[in-house]
Amino acid sequence: MQTRKTFSWIKEEITRSISVLLMIYIITWASISNAYPIFAQQGYENPREATGRIVCANCHLANKPVDIEVPQAVLPDTVFEAVVRIPYDMQLKQVLANGKKGALNVGAVLILPEGFELAPPDRISPEMKEKMGNLSFQSYRPTKKNILVIGPVPGQKYSEITFPILSPDPAAKKDVHFLKYPIYVGGNRGRGQIYPDGSKSNNTVYNATAAGIVSKIIRKEKGGYEITITDASEGRQVIDIIPPGPELLVSEGESIKLDQPLTSNPNVGGFGQGDAEIVLQDPLRVQGLLFFLASVILAQIFLVLKKKQFEKVQLSEMNF
C-alpha cells in the first residue's frame, strides 16, 4: 500500500514538472517569436512600402542616420560585402522592458535586387567571416531570399554589420540582367515605441488622456505610476497607467491639459533608412574595355616611336 502511494506521488511530481517546463518553453518561444525582426515579418509581406518607406519606422518613431557601403560594380556569381553602419553614442543607456536601464541593441533589414542573396558559408572567405563575427542572418521570407534581416544584436559590438552577398549569374537566371540596381537598407538602434498591435511600449512619452487636476499619484510596487485625473467641471475621473521606465513630469494638484505629457521621453534610439546603387557588370564588357585601353596605349606608343623616327629622318636630311 505504501509503495503504491509513493509511486503515485512520484508520478504526480513528474507530471507537474513536465507541465511547468512546457509552460516555460511556450512563454519563452512566444517571447522570442515576438522579437524584432519578427514583428515586421509577421505583419508585412514586404518591408518596403510603395512610398519607399521601410515599415520598421512604424514602431521606431525617432529618425536617426544609417549608412551603407557596397562596391560600385560586381561580376556575376561573386561574393561581396555590404557594410551597414548604425552609429550612436555608445555611452547611452536605453529603458528595458522591466524599466531598468541597459545597453542598446541594433537591427537591420537589407533589401537587395532580385537574384542577389546571402552567400553560402562555403563561399565566404576567412577575412569576411572575421568581419561578420557571430551574426546569424535570415531571409525575410523563404521566397524572398533577396531581403535579409538581422537583430536584435548588441549595439556596442555590432554597430557595423557586414552582410556577405552573392551576386546572381544572368547565364543561369534568365530574369537577371547586366544593369545598375538599387539597394535599400533600414537600421535601428534601441527599442521601439509602438508595438505592432498599436499599443505603446515603455520606451516612449505618455500623455494625459483627459484635462483636469491631478488628484492622485500612486507609485506601483514594481515600478510605474497610476495617475488619477479629475475633471472639475464634470466630476469625472480618469486613470492613466504609466509603465516602469519613463520619468514622471507632473505632481498632485497640478492642472493639466488634454494630451499634455505626463512623462519624459526615455527613447534614446531611432530608425533610419538609406540606399545605394550597384552595377552587375558583364565580364565581356570588362574584357572589351581592357582591350580598348590596351589598344589606346599601344597606339600612343607607336605614335611616339613614329614621331621619333620622323625626327631622326628630318635631322639626317638637314645634316646632309
Swiss-Prot record:
Binds 1 heme group covalently. GO terms for cellular component: chloroplast thylakoid membrane. It is found in: Plastid, Chloroplast thylakoid membrane. It holds the Pfam family Apocytochr_F_N. Its cofactor is heme. One of its GO terms (molecular function) is electron transfer activity. Residues 1-35 form the signal peptide. Keywords: Chloroplast, Electron transport, Heme, Iron, Membrane, Metal-binding, Photosynthesis, Plastid, Signal, Thylakoid, Transmembrane, Transmembrane helix, Transport. Belongs to the cytochrome f family. HAMAP family: Cytb6_f_cytF (MF_00610). PANTHER family: CYTOCHROME F (PTHR33288:SF10), PTHR33288. The 4 large subunits of the cytochrome b6-f complex are cytochrome b6, subunit IV (17 kDa polypeptide, petD), cytochrome f and the Rieske protein, while the 4 small subunits are PetG, PetL, PetM and PetN. The complex functions as a dimer. Component of the cytochrome b6-f complex, which mediates electron transfer between photosystem II (PSII) and photosystem I (PSI), cyclic electron flow around PSI, and state transitions. This is Cytochrome f. The lineage of its organism: Eukaryota, Viridiplantae, Streptophyta, Embryophyta, Tracheophyta.
